[in-house]
Amino acid sequence: MAQKIIGRKQEIKELLDLYKENKPVFAVIYGRRRVGKTFLVRELFQDKMSFYHTGLSPYELSGQKIMEQQLTSFYSSLVRYGSKGKKVPSSWLEAFDALINLLEEQDADKRQVIFIDELPWLDTPRSGFVTALEHFWNGWAAGKQNIMLVVCGSATSWISDKLLNNKGGLFDRTTDEIKLRPFTLGECEEYYQANNIVMSKFDQIQCYMATGGIPYYISMLQKGKSLAQNMDRLFFEPAAKLGLEFDRLYSSLFTNAEDCMTIVRLLAQKRQGYTRKEIVSLTKIPDGGGLSATLKSLEVSDFITSYVKYDYPKREVYFRLTDFYSKFYLSFIDGRKTTNPHFWQDNLLTPELTAWRGFTFESLCYYHLPQIKQALGISGVQTEVSPWKSRKEKDGAQIDMIIDRADRIINVCEMKFCEDDFSINAAYDKNLRHKLSTFAEETKCRSSLHLTLVTTYGLKFNEYAGRVQSVVTMDDLFK
């Protein structure tokens, strides 16, 4: 079944190797919601599973007896796989004992794959779920050579705290962990080809700017429609699926969803993000352990990224929004009163959309840093990457991306999203020279500065083109 899976070659190899091992396996797969965790495991092991269960979303169960509902659902899965239990377990200890009984009735010489999806959702308040899971693994499964327990979760911070960094009975018990990330541009292209969706690379990049390479989102695209038609259908028509996704997404992942959404909305306002101190001041969320946990949860779930600006003496940490879907939603849907179901088609050439493409292309380039390094021939060179802005000029020089290399070269990267080859004119050449000289003067760097252009189609040759040392095109980003 693995041939149906787009990309994920390393993850497929890892899971199949674990399946072939003659020892107990406790594998944890985590990553952002909608990224394809469930699909990956089901396609690989659908005819090999001895038990499969998925937790119920607390978002959908709000106000109900959540633990009771989760146990009832778990019992239904047990019965589906042959359990002879006559009643719904009253606790998670009983539920896992019933699972042990079910597995012991099956062939002990055969590899038994147990797949529990959305595991964090089962851990409702005061449920004792983690203790019961410890009992199941330490007291039974860890002693069975044929057991392969695979658990998935979108609540990445829960996975990190309760499994990967557990200080109790599950300390150091997981045998393998896989973080599943969104598709790259190249993997998206592979998906489109496999599903007969015809789209130019130029449009694929714009699609990525809105969907972030999330497999579930791009699976909604309809072949035979233009990108603009699909954008309107998914985001702007009445009851558009992705127009309604934002609240559902955060509420299903985070127990403190309101604080998370407040921080994300703030970070969406400024491309380079804010410091922790600024976040406290602007959101009025109290500084302390709660804020630390919230920022950590957002970061491990790949919604935000922390970084330190190049050559800033305080080494102050900044947080910026890096989830493409969230940025798109907050830019064009959140709080808007427009009811135009053809908003995207009607505004393709407006300054607002042109500016959005330019800013978001920078984020896309950061996500595809490995492809940029490969194009520059420095994949094996240690690098530090960040934006830079002059500290001496109020509205002065700033550089989209600095790649500071261990071989004493600094790639000063300019990102340009264009519909044709990019042309450097006299004014832009002057601007570039100012950026390079200001950067060299303020940072006192001793490395050689290589001006690098990352753009869609390439650089038009003229009298100013020689200043550019290297060009990375969108074709390189798809590799």
Q: What function would you assign to each model-found segment?
A:
Residues 1-351, 451:
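Phosphate-binding site recognition
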Residues 310-312, 317-479:
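A cross-kingdom feature that marks ATP-driven nucleic-acid transaction machinery
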